[in-house]
Amino acid sequence: MDIRAAEISAILKDQIKNFGQEAEVTEVGQVLSVGDGIARVYGLDNVQAGEMVEFENGTRGMALNLETDNVGIVIFGADREIKEGQTVKRTRAIVDTPVGKGLLGRVVDALGNPIDGKGPIQSTERKRVDVKAPGIIPRKSVNEPMATGLKAIDALIPVGRGQRELIIGDRQTGKTAIALDTILNQKPLNVEGAPEGQKLYCVYVAIGQKRSTVAQFVKVLEEQGALEYSIVVAATASDPAPMQYIAPFTGCTMGEYFRDNGMHAVIIYDDLSKQAVAYRQMSLLLRRPPGREAYPGDVFYLHSRLLERAAKLNEDHGSGSLTALPIIETQANDVSAYIPTNVISITDGQIFLETDLFFQGIRPAVNVGLSVSRVGSSAQTKAMKKVAGKIKGELAQYREMAAFAQFGSDLDASTQRLLNRGSRLTELLKQPQFSPLKMEEQVVVIYAGVNGYLDPLPVSKVRAFEDGLLSLLRGKNVEILNTIRDSRDLSNETAAQLKSVVEGYAKTFA
């Protein structure tokens, strides 16, 4: 067999020509020590603060402490498989998450990975979880309502789109119930074909809660048809502290996608006390100096940089908004503890829930005296302003008088009248769970209350009166509700029509 050298060299040259060798250079370090969800790593000299790193077994971590001789890394997962001497490599990416409409209807973990068993997320875009809040120029003052569907809140402590309203109270006072009702109340706005400017997408971040609680929450959303316009981010009690720390930022980035694209979203952080506890744990293990109540010095900055990202943007920036409803759990009604005072000072008002009111049957258990909205009536429709202005004054007088009435038995007629009216208005503001009311329905109910149509009734009959009046208006007199809804105002003409309907109903009811 004749082998020609020229042929062989031609074949070899041809093969060598197509042989491209690309060396991939990655910066790696070595684990010095690991334990309690923290790894100390030597050798990652150029790592950035907040950068994702990857351990040998695929577990991810985040570089938080950049020291002279080592890097403190918090681990997003179990640290059992990580051993001293193993290599750690940089990913050159700051922690990010998928964003977009593909996340709606899904339950994800603190890094945006699906945990609901419905397959991969249909999302192409990724965004960093910890970004700067919008500056002063892109913002606009809050001017449109974000209806919760709860009379006690929409009338007395109105929340606007782009506002940050704290929900604060002891355990088991109905904080999550208010958040859930707010999500359910957005269902009529999120119907197919509704304009984007009207829709309000919901993001719910569960931090440090039991898995059974989160599962129950998702089940209710599904049953009520509210999951399709909601995203649930869950970092449960059994997840590592770094996951509970990062979850609110992940949820916020998902909400910001809507805000920055001219849409509207509301995000609920349930709850930030547990995030602060997780952050305290991480900080102490990273040997950062402790401050008051052993929290690190920058725990205020932790919450302020998160809540400042909720904003109403002006027309030049798309008019989008992100409303934040952070939840804080107090211990024995102590609002003056460290974390509650911090978050109260950052937010634009608070809804204060009380155990005593809850057990008296006043639910939602809102303490109207201590709750405020610093945005106020600019977050209300004209119709609601007209009827709610009176109810605020009457309830304030009622609280004052009720305190005095405990001492004296012989009260003059006007005081007695005020106490009667107050007790009926308090009864009127009660509302069962999962039954949010539309704005126009709240207006007619409160109109009946402040104009004295409930005064002759016994307190026990107030609920029946309200239900009957609403069913009458939803049936025969639906045009009154439609007029209030479309004009967002209670004109003299509509008020006259409403007055005759309410008077007629009051006579038949008695």
UniProtKB/Swiss-Prot annotation:
It is a peripheral membrane protein. Produces ATP from ADP in the presence of a proton gradient across the membrane. The alpha chain is a regulatory subunit. GO terms for cellular component: plasma membrane; proton-transporting ATP synthase complex. Its EC number is 7.1.2.2. It catalyses: ATP + H2O + 4 H(+)(in) = ADP + phosphate + 5 H(+)(out). Its main location: membrane. F-type ATPases have 2 components, CF(1) - the catalytic core - and CF(0) - the membrane proton channel. CF(1) has five subunits: alpha(3), beta(3), gamma(1), delta(1), epsilon(1). CF(0) has four main subunits: a(1), b(1), b'(1) and c(9-12). This is ATP synthase subunit alpha. It is an enzyme of class 7 (translocase).
